[in-house]
Design a protein with these regions (language model features):
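Bacterial N-terminal signal peptides
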Residues: 10-21
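N-terminal secretory signal peptides that target proteins for export/translocation
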Residues: 1-7
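Aromatic, loop-rich ligand-recognition surfaces of beta-strand-rich domains
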Residues: 431-623, 688-693
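Conserved phosphate-binding loops in nucleotide/dinucleotide-binding enzymes
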Residues: 75-78, 873-880, 945
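Residues that flank catalytic or metal-binding motifs in active/ligand-binding sites
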Residues: 49, 59-61, 83, 140-142, ...
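Aromatic- and Gly/Pro-enriched helix-to-coil junctions and flexible linker segments
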Residues: 22-292, 357, 377-437, 442, ...
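Helix-loop-helix junctions that connect adjacent transmembrane helices in secondary transporters/permeases
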Residues: 936-948
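An acidic, gly/pro-interrupted, aromatic-rich
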Residues: 168, 172-177, 275-277, 285, ...
Length: 967
């Protein structure tokens, strides 16, 4: 009998935990005369007791029971020799303990079962070729969402109100209401309908003029024409594009600990908005999202669609450890797989990364087939231009580049001559350099005592830093008195004042490197010079004899990329700030680096004539550079890099890239094998073809998931609740549809309409279900508390973006500029990691629609964040709606809303006249609430204005529920 060490024995004690069966069967009854039937007797036993903990994705004890070969490779089974098969040892009851090692958490196997396994091994352990055992998920291929679309006839019911018998949508809805003895609500008022429809399609309030015109229009098709107008309005794409950006987790920073801005991701946002406005077929959108670079190589409007795969968070630290780097790469592709599965198919495919899905029929093999599909996709930017544009640009640039190269060649010849002369005299120069070079961590200069009211540091030369973006830096600047108890009289707390221009890197905070940091007495924060001079004014004239300054006293930021190093300087003092006396300089210090050494030689040796010649060359080169800069670069967009990555591709055991299991190839998911024709590609197939085949499979006519998920999303965004209330999970852990026949009817309508969305949206909005009032009825709520069955229109609070856009719209400040780079509601500082600080002041550049905000991950934006705008580190297929004290405080006290209260008051005075208080009140109610004030409201508003002012009324109305809730 083969013996195993105790440690391995302990590992095996995790085997045989009870699972649901892959092959449903009763406990086998052995027949001692017939040969053991593996599929009927052994497979059910292993699946029922063992496979959960011992499968390719979860090899506890380094054992997988999925295939005969994997059991043999682990050393647990020797066909024909049960006495040498350790598998039998762990399931036998021990004479010492009276227990079997396995199964650990369940009852021991029966003697008949052990005898059956023993016979099977003795007979040679027959195992059908190609058979792999796997655990059974809670939902199988018969799950409702995996079935073909069923075209059910809309129910007919003569008891339904006449206006509910026309639309198929209403007939489906009414049938469910009747089942629960519920009745629909009456039709909403015209004011409620135009407000509901306008917000629903555009995310903006209707204007008072639009409300008045709609209420006045008594024609039968007035409401239909309203919907047609709103669907054609450019604001439609902005609002519905925002919904889709939530689903695809679009963000404009990379997330993780560095979280740096991605400044060129905005073309994807514009592409999404444009696609919705143009009513682009959704199947085409899916293909462009997954393979836009494949089908539209020379069409930027198509290529940009493939940003979908790389618009999520990713770790860009660039870990040098190969194990960690492989894990980061696996996490990056996991984001693509999860988003693809959830956005288009409503399947939580990511749950099968480490093992077969516990709830849905998604194999780990399916996950890694998708992994192979996306293996060639990496985050990054690339130039987007068609060949003609590239050629035209090359023709413009080439002669200028040739001219510049010749100028540089002539300039270099002069510089080389100067450098050669300088090297010949280097020994003589170096004799004069007797002191140690200046150091970043500190420079000390002493000199005979001198009286000073002002002290000035002047840069005379910098050590070259090819990555420098700004001037030199000063951490601390100290001026010490010449007495028995020296004091640093430069300190701000001792009355010192610092003067000097700051240098800012684009995106830094104002004051991030302020000159005052040189005398704050704190090591670390520094001034980055925007001018050669730093001047310190002392509180009173002092006798001084020592000055100390540093670029980086702590030594923690010596490789800082933003600043050069002050290598040459002079120090001067003055009593009046006009006449200056030099007290120290670096003229006799050694160079700080080899590049600085060459520069000093060069400066000492260059003649007046040579300097003049070089200046002339520099002037000509700058002119050529100016002309080159005037030629616009082809756009570089965040669309990802796509490279060929060939197989073999493996399942990662337990999700660990270091533990490679069975091989896989790019292929469709087996989840839909019964209803949709699948595909399987070679491991070395072109990487673009893999993504294109996946996209075509997702939108194939027999795939029931994609249209169902899409139809449900449309329903959710119109009613605030989906037919399936988990929009991105149509599996076992999601909810089942409240109206399954209606969902399939909508799905088929989408397909019949060539995947265009506006027509089905119009049908939804023309339904009586959509046009119901939102009045609460206690009896109905007891049966259907959240109105999923639609006995009324579910009221909702506006989203954070809608609230912000509404405030700007009613004040007349909304900037409707479409497209292009976004604006920021935060200040952005990048110094290896990024920091985002919400703005405290808001100018016209921030008054665009919120969809154009540069939506950085984890960047808190008070109003938007407080009103539940999601963190786009994750997809947000369904937004949460919370009610918190912070929301009321933000609307009442935030600088943005205070500004808009003033703007609104100014608009009311302009629209209604400065002296007509009652007209101002009426106009305010029309703008904010789309109605006239009631008499008691008019009186209360008049009293508030009299007691305070018009701004107070505006502030109060902005803080009302009626503004931010939609009936």
């Amino acid at each position: 009998m083969t013996q195993f060490p105790l440690a391995r024995f302990c590992l095996i004690t995790l085997i045989l935990t009870v699972l649901s069966l892959l092959v449903t069967a009763a406990e086998p009854t052995p027949d001692s005369t017939a040969k053991v039937n593996f599929e009927k007797e052994i497979a059910p036993l292993l699946v029922h007791h063992c496979i959960r903990c011992h499968n390719p994705g979860n090899e506890k004890g380094d054992l997988s029971l999925a295939t005969l070969q994997s059991i043999k490779d682990a050393g647990y089974l020797t066909p024909g020799k049960p006495e040498e098969s350790y598998l039998l040892d762990v399931i036998h009851t021990s004479a010492d303990t009276g227990k079997a090692a396995m199964p650990k958490e369940g009852p021991p196997l029966k003697k008949a079962q052990i005898a059956l396994l023993t016979r099977w091994i003795k007979e040679g352990a027959a195992w059908p070729a190609g058979l792999t055992l796997q655990e059974k998920s809670k939902a199988d291929l018969s799950w409702w969402s995996l079935q073909p679309l069923a075209e059910a006839a809309p129910p007919e019911d003569k008891d339904a109100p006449a206006n509910w018998q026309t639309s198929p949508i209403d007939r489906f809805i009414f049938a469910k209401l009747k089942e629960k003895n519920l009745k629909p609500a009456p039709r909403a008022t015209k004011r409620e309908l135009i407000r509901r429809a306008t917000y629903n399609l555009t995310g903006l309030p209707p204007t008072p003029e639009e409300v008045a015109a709609f209420e006045k229009d008594q024609s039968p098709d007035a409401y239909e024409r309203l919907i047609d107008r709103l669907l054609a309005f450019p604001r439609y794409g902005e609002h519905w594009g925002r919904h889709w950006l939530d689903v695809v987790r679009f963000g404009e920073s990379n997330g993780f600990e560095r979280n740096v801005i991605i400044d060129n991701a905005w073309p994807f946002r514009d592409y999404v908005i444009r696609s919705f406005n143009e009513d682009k077929p959704f199947d085409q959108l899916v293909i462009e999202h997954l393979a836009g670079d494949v089908i539209g190589k020379n069409d930027p409007d198509v290529v940009v669609g493939s940003t979908f795969l790389v618009c999520g968070p990713y770790d860009n630290v660039g870990n040098q450890d190969p194990v960690q780097a492989a894990q980061i790469r696996a996490n990056t592709i996991d984001d693509m797989i999860r988003t693809t599965g959830e956005a288009f198919l409503g399947l939580t495919v990511g749950c099968s990364r480490c093992h077969n899905h516990k709830f849905d029929p998604i194999k780990q093999q399916d996950y890694y087939s998708l992994y192979a599909t996306f293996a060639g996709v990496r985050h990054g930017s690339r130039v987007i231009a068609d060949p003609q544009d590239r050629q035209a640009q090359t023709q413009k640039r080439q002669p200028l580049q040739t001219e510049k190269a010749e100028l540089l060649k002539q300039k270099s010849a002069i510089e080389n001559t100067i450098q050669q002369r300088a090297e010949q005299k280097s020994a003589a120069y170096e004799k004069e350099w007797t002191r140690e070079p200046a150091k970043r961590t500190g420079v000390e200069e002493t000199f005979p005592p001198v009286t000073a009211k002002y002290v000035r540091l002047t840069s005379q030369g910098l050590d070259t830093n090819p990555r420098a973006m700004t001037g030199y830096r000063v951490d601390e600047f100290e001026v010490w008195t010449a007495d028995d108890r020296p004091q640093n009289v430069a300190l701000a707390r001792n009355g010192g004042k610092a003067t000097g221009a700051n240098s800012r890197v684009a995106g830094d905070f104002a004051g991030a490197y302020d000159v005052g940091l040189t005398i704050d007495g704190k090591i670390g924060a520094c001034w980055i010079a925007g001018s050669p001079d730093l001047t310190i004014e002392l509180k009173a004239p002092q006798t001084i004899n020592r000055i100390v300054f540093s670029s980086d006293r702590s030594g923690a930021a010596m490789s800082n990329y933003k600043a050069t190093f002050l290598a040459e300087y002079k120090l001067e003092v003055s009593t009046d700030g006009k006449t200056w006396q030099e007290v120290a300089s670096s003229h006799n210090r050694k160079p700080v680096s080899s590049s600085h050494r060459r520069k000093r030689f060069y400066d000492l040796e260059v003649t007046v004539e040579e300097r003049s010649q070089l200046n002339e060359f520099n002037k000509k080169i700058r002119e050529v550079d100016r002309q080159l800069a005037a030629i616009p670069d082809p756009p570089s967009w965040w669309v990802g890099h796509h490279s060929q990555v060939n197989g073999p591709f493996h399942i990662f055991v337990g999700g660990n890239p270091q533990r490679k299991g069975e091989t896989v190839v790019p292929a469709s998911m087996t989840t839909l094998n019964k209803v949709t024709e699948g595909y399987k590609l070679d491991a070395n197939s072109p990487q673009g073809q893999r993504r294109l085949e996946l996209a075509r499979w997702i939108v194939s006519k027999d795939n029931p998931l994609t249209p169902r998920v899409l139809a449900n999303r449309l329903w959710y965004y119109h009613f605030g609740t989906g037919i399936v209330s988990t929009p991105s999970d149509f599996g076992y852990m999601g909810t089942k549809p409240s109206h399954p026949e209606l969902l399939d009817w909508l799905s088929l309508q989408i397909q019949k309409n060539d995947w265009r969305l506006k027509d089905i949206q119009k049908q939804i909005m023309l339904s009586q279900a959509y046009q119901q009032a939102s009045n609460f009825r206690e009896d109905a709520a007891r049966i259907d508390s959240d109105s999923r069955l639609l006995w009324r229109f579910p009221p909702r609070r506006l989203s954070g973006e809608e609230i912000r856009d509404t405030l700007l719209s009613v004040t007349g400040k909304l900037n409707l500029k479409m497209g292009g780079p976004g604006f920021r509601l935060y200040e952005y500082l990048q110094d290896n990691v990024a920091t985002y600080v919400p703005l405290e002041e808001f100018g016209p550049e921030t008054y665009r629609r919120a969809v154009y905000h540069q939506n950085a991950r984890a960047a808190r934006v008070d109003l938007l964040t407080d009103f539940d705008c999601p963190d786009n580190a994750f997809a947000a297929p369904r937004r949460n709606t919370t009610t918190t004290p912070l929301q009321a405080l933000t609307l009442m006290n935030h600088q943005f809303t205070l500004d808009l209260s003033r703007f609104l008051a100014a608009r009311l005075r302009q629209d209604a006249g400065t002296e007509h208080v009652d007209q101002q009140i009426v106009r305010a109610f029309q703008l904010l609430y789309s109605r006239a004030p009631r008499s008691e409201e008019q009186q209360a508003a008049r009293a508030l204005i009299a007691a305070s002012d018009l701004e107070a009324l505006c502030r109060a109305m902005i803080n009302s529920n009626e503004l931010i809730y939609l009936d």
